[in-house]
Amino acid sequence: MDAQSSAKVNSRKRRKEASSPNGATEEDGIPSKVQHCSVGLRQPAPFSDEIEVDFSKPYVRVTMEEACRGTPCERPVRVYADGIFDLFHSGHARALMQAKNLFPNTYPIVGVCSDELTHNFKGFTVMNENERYDAVQHCRYVDEVVRNAPWTLTPEFLAEHRIDFVAHDDIPYSSAGSDDVYKHIKEAGMFAPTQRTEGISTSDIITRIVRDYDVYARRNLQRGYTAKELNVSFINEKKYHLQERVDKVKKKVKDVEEKSKEFVQKVEERSIDLIQTWEEKSREFIGSFLEMFGPEGALKHMLKEGKGRMLQAISPRQSPSSSPTHERSPSPSFRWPFSGKTSPSSSPASLSRHKAVTCDISEDEED
């Protein structure tokens, strides 16, 4: 095999080794997908007092270097994380996820403090201890739950549960007369720091509820809870009911306003359409009117043509200028029929008037 072919084989081997189970490689810039795994997710994590431990075998704690390098499958690194876990939220889950992923082979053990210890050292809780135990049990990152965990970890407790490391955020936790309850754990080299999730905590959730207390009280009253169950006084109960009615009226008014705005908008759009249509029709009407009655309209041409025909029909045709003119003979004198007698002789004045009238009639006929 020559050098070129061997280089190709080696490059294929490197790409195959670098590829993920689904075929994606880092060179391609495609993040590899995580394979689906349902092992250990069908049942909640067991309690520590329900697990049988063989104390006859000696337990040797692993070092940080050995834990980071990886341990055999039968010897996982036992990491302990404790807390109150009241109103279990995503911040708790993320902290336990970090504890689970501290080392390649990790067995997380989570301790939950009882109500008595919590009420004495920290304050009242929303959920009781059984509810908090159950919430932690159903977290996918937990392999074992310790009930009634101690507030301060003792060497006896660490040896009893064979704990290798303790996981918690690095912020000093002052309580029980100590500036930091994890100080001796840090000095022993058993502390594995995790990161706190910002923006979410049990105190933040309680603060939100207290801040909007009236809203949640009214909400639960609507859902059937009594004022006694909510620890609400008679006056506040009536106040909440009145506020609810006022809010309903406001909502109706707002709906009416929105509908009226929509109606006005539709009317405006319709009016704009009508105005545009009216303008188009008016232009058509004006154009048709001008075509009929304008200065050069059809009606004027019709009137001119009709006038010309009427004048042609009324006036006689003129004779040609070259033809000789015919003189008419004077019209005979008018006489009454059946009159055999001649009229008496007229006076000279009457004769002259008769001649003048006769001349006028003859001139009119010539014209």
Curated annotation (Swiss-Prot):
Pfam families: CTP_transf_like. Pathway: Phospholipid metabolism; phosphatidylcholine biosynthesis; phosphatidylcholine from phosphocholine: step 1/2. It is a peripheral membrane protein. GO terms for cellular component: cytosol; endoplasmic reticulum membrane; nucleus. Sequence repeats lie at residues 319-324, 329-333, 343-348. Its main location: cytoplasm. CTP binds at I84, F85, H92, K122, H168, D169, Y173, Q195, R196, T197, I200. Residues 330-351 have a biased composition (Low complexity). This is Choline-phosphate cytidylyltransferase A. It comes from Cricetulus griseus.
